[in-house]
Curated annotation (Swiss-Prot):
Name this polypeptide is given: ATP synthase subunit alpha
Location(s) in or outside the cell: Cell membrane
Keywords attached to this entry: ATP synthesis, ATP-binding, Cell membrane, CF(1), Hydrogen ion transport, Ion transport, Membrane, Nucleotide-binding, Translocase, Transport
Gene3D superfamilies xref list: 2.40.30.20, ATP synthase alpha/beta chain, C-terminal domain, P-loop containing nucleotide triphosphate hydrolases
Subunit structure: F-type ATPases have 2 components, CF(1) - the catalytic core - and CF(0) - the membrane proton channel. CF(1) has five subunits: alpha(3), beta(3), gamma(1), delta(1), epsilon(1). CF(0) has three main subunits: a(1), b(2) and c(9-12). The alpha and beta chains form an alternating ring which encloses part of the gamma chain. CF(1) is attached to CF(0) by a central stalk formed by the gamma and epsilon chains, while a peripheral stalk is formed by the delta and b chains.
Broad class of enzyme this protein falls into: translocase
GO cellular component: plasma membrane; proton-transporting ATP synthase complex
InterPro entries attached to this UniProt entry: ATP_synth_asu-like_sf (IPR023366), ATP_synth_asu_C (IPR000793), ATP_synth_asu_C_sf (IPR038376), ATP_synth_F1_a_nt-bd_dom (IPR033732), ATP_synth_F1_asu (IPR005294), ATPase_a/bsu_AS (IPR020003), ATPase_F1/V1/A1_a/bsu_N (IPR004100), ATPase_F1/V1/A1_a/bsu_N_sf (IPR036121)
NCBIfam families hit by this protein: atpA, PRK13343.1
Residues annotated for ATP binding in this entry: G169, D170, R171, K172, T173, G174, K175, T176
Record keyword Transcription regulation present: no
Principal subcellular localisation of the protein: membrane
Organism: Leuconostoc citreum (strain KM20)
Reactions catalysed according to its record: ATP + H2O + 4 H(+)(in) = ADP + phosphate + 5 H(+)(out)
Length: 504
């Protein structure tokens, strides 16, 4: 076959035209140490703090330590394929995660990748994991309520949209249950929820996700999971990833609730990384910037000003204490960062008072402004009554000859404790709470036997719903307490029937 000279020259010309003369400059380093989710590399003199670096096998890492001759890198993912002597190059980018509506209803890992087996997440929106929190002038004071559906919280330690409220207590005192119930109550509240599970057992997270799915809560929830078997960098990053996902909605004028379950495990993971990176240890072997670890995360929760769309992100961080010691390092740090705390008491929990909220040590610093007027009126003296009851109760153990006024206070206190008990995964709408607490504070429950109180409140709600539904409508529409005469009449009418049924 004869080869035409013209064809050859045409092919050569074509190749020459395609030839790219531009040079691509890459800064490449060499891995000198690898292990425990951390790598060290030399030759990356211009690497920036927090920059994404790419290893030879395609795994990414993040520059954490910038030293004179080496860079300390936390590895984002598995590190089994990385060896000493491998190359690692700069990308010039910082870490970003996928965000947007497409993530709602999904379970993702700390890199935003789906782990629920429901296929890939198609989104073209990404946000950086580390972002500066909104400044003072970009914020607005908290004024809208976040209804948790838990009587003890909505009445005693109300939470507002844009607030940071810490849930703190020993292990197995119902911290996660409190958060899950709050998520369930957001069903018709126009909220998007992000649940960040940090170092929780995979079986536990699976159970929580199934609960949310059965109750229809996955329709507005994103779950970010960093399990205990994953490398420490994933546990460290997971909360920031959740915050980035929440900010996408917040800056678009929506309302977000984010639960960090729990930040004690994030602090432990960060301590592990810092020690491997040879950072100087401080109190309890945590690094010096462990306060900044949590403050820069929790400051990202805010109520934005009207100019920025008026969106909000409410944070419910969870901290686990050891034997009720809230004066340990991490608990005191997070208490000082947040706008109040819900303290769960192990003794009350084991005594059957659930949720085991300690009214004396729980506080909400800004939520009072967000409480609806009706709730403010009926719950005004509840906290003081409960605190004085606890005081009297311990005093009453030493003597039985108490005067009538003290006996009455103790009786009211026992009924208050009973009213504030609530079954698991049964959040109560605010209008129902108002009616029940009104009946309590106005003495209608004083002569009901303690063991009948749960039945009394359930039947009272059903009665008002069927016979005086306008009371609920007034509370929902105006946020005000209905006419006292109408409420008294409804409760008295119900009580007449209830007393009869109890006497049978």
């Amino acid at each position: 076959m004869a080869i035409q000279a013209e064809e050859i020259s045409a092919l050569i010309k074509q190749q020459l035209e395609k030839f790219d003369t531009t040079l691509t400059v890459e800064e490449v380093g060499t891995v000198t140490y690898i292990g425990d989710g951390v790598a060290r590399a030399t030759g990356l003199a211009n690497a920036m703090a927090g920059e994404l670096l790419e290893f030879a096998n395609g795994t990414f890492g993040m520059a954490q330590n910038l030293e004179s001759s080496e860079v300390g890198i936390i590895i984002l993912g598995g590190f089994d394929d990385i060896r000493e002597g491998d190359t690692v190059k700069r990308t010039g980018r910082i870490m970003e995660v996928p965000v947007g509506e497409q993530l709602i209803g999904r379970v993702v890992n700390a890199l935003g990748q789906p782990i629920d087996g429901l296929g890939e997440i198609k989104t073209d929106k990404f946000r950086p994991v580390e972002v500066k929190a909104p400044g003072v002038m970009q914020r607005k004071s908290v004024f809208e309520p976040l209804q948790t559906g838990i009587k003890a919280i909505d009445a005693l330690v109300p939470i507002g949209r844009g607030q940071r409220e810490l849930i703190i207590g020993d292990r197995k005192t119902g911290k996660t249950s409190l958060a899950i119930d709050t998520i369930l109550n957001q069903k018709d509240q126009n909220m998007i929820v992000i649940y960040v599970a940090i170092g929780q057992k995979d079986s536990t997270v699976r159970t929580q996700v199934e609960t949310l799915r059965q109750m229809g809560a996955m329709d507005y929830t994103i779950v970010v999971n960093a399990g205990p078997s994953e490398p420490a960098p994933m546990l460290y990053l997971a909360p920031y990833v959740g915050a980035a996902m929440g900010e996408e909605f917040m800056y678009n004028g929506k309302h977000v609730l984010i639960v960090y379950d729990d930040l004690s495990k994030q602090a432990t993971a960060y301590r592990e990384l810092s020690l491997i990176l040879r950072r100087p240890p401080g109190r309890e072997a945590y690094p010096g910037d462990v306060f900044y670890l949590h403050s820069r995360l929790l400051e990202r929760a805010a109520k934005l000003s009207d100019e920025l769309g008026g969106g909000s992100m409410t944070a419910l961080p969870i901290i686990e204490t050891q034997a009720g010691d809230v004066s340990a390092y991490i608990p005191t740090n997070v208490i000082s960062i947040t706008d109040g705390q819900v303290f769960l008491d192990a003794d009350q929990f084991y005594a059957g008072v659930r949720p085991a909220i300690d009214a004396g040590t729980s506080v909400s610093r800004v939520g009072g402004d967000a409480q609806i007027k009706a709730m403010k009126k009926v719950a005004g003296t509840l906290r003081l009554d409960l605190a004085s009851f606890r005081e009297l109760e311990s005093f009453a153990q030493f003597g039985s000859d108490l005067d009538a006024a003290t006996q009455a206070k103790l009786a009211r206190g026992r009924r208050t404790v009973e009213v504030l008990k609530q079954p698991l995964h049964k959040p109560m709408p605010v209008q129902h709470q108002v009616i029940v607490l009104y009946a309590l504070t106005h003495g209608y429950i004083d002569d009901i036997a303690v063991e009948d109180i749960q039945r009394f409140q359930d039947e009272l709600i059903a009665y008002v719903d069927a016979n005086a539904n306008d009371l609920f409508k007034v509370i929902i529409d105006t946020k005000q307490l209905p006419e006292e005469s109408a409420m008294n009449a409804a409760i008295e009418a119900f009580k007449a029937g209830f007393a009869g049924s109890a006497a049978e």
